[in-house]
From Swiss-Prot:
Name of the protein: Murein peptide amidase A
GO MF entries: amidase activity; murein tripeptide carboxypeptidase activity; zinc ion binding
Originating species: Escherichia coli O157:H7
Active site location: 210 (proton donor/acceptor)
Limits of the Peptidase M14 domain: 1-234
Amino acid sequence: MTVTRPRAERGAFPPGTEHYGRSLLGAPLIWFPAPAASRESGLILAGTHGDENSSVVTLSCALRTLTPSLRRHHVVLCVNPDGCQLGLRANANGVDLNRNFPAANWKEGETVYRWNSAAEERDVVLLTGDKPGSEPETQALCQLIHRIQPAWVVSFHDPLACIEDPRHSELGEWLAQAFELPLVTSVGYETPGSFGSWCADLNLHCITAEFPPISSDEASEKYLFAMANLLRWHPKDAIRPS
């Protein structure tokens, strides 16, 4: 069996998508169950921040490139479809979803981020939500994870150019080699109410994969086969990083 589909067939997704909820503005929240699912299946996420689209495009390309029957891991291509549609980091309520998860360290009030990679200050204000897990996108993702019980999660972001894995695991090392990014145990600042914090409360292994500042076009060329190999990764198979 060939590992990849012919390029001419990659313009559309293979069948098999499901809905796990709706966004604040009513967009369907879509996930891609793994055709070759097992107890060892993980979950791969992108699009938590709507202004971070290079990993969304690359993950989409990988989903359409890999032969579907080889995919071992579940995918949520876009956690925040309203933000992606509007080009916002936040959801349509102005809430940073990565500060809204019902983690023990959630903090009420405001959070700040950098306008872009050239900005020196974190001075753009977003909200963390009225309460932990207040947003429909957050609630739906938490429910999905409780339902499918993934063995691990890899959450894609940008532009910090690193693989953050507090456990320094075999998968973390593989990701660092495959994507040619440094492996770190922390991004260096507090992230109260983040998805990773919530996963830590559940003892669910979460790795945050941060692309560098990169265009979608370049990312889909540079990282396509690393992403496709992640979709079928298994430690026993010793899949080469690239």
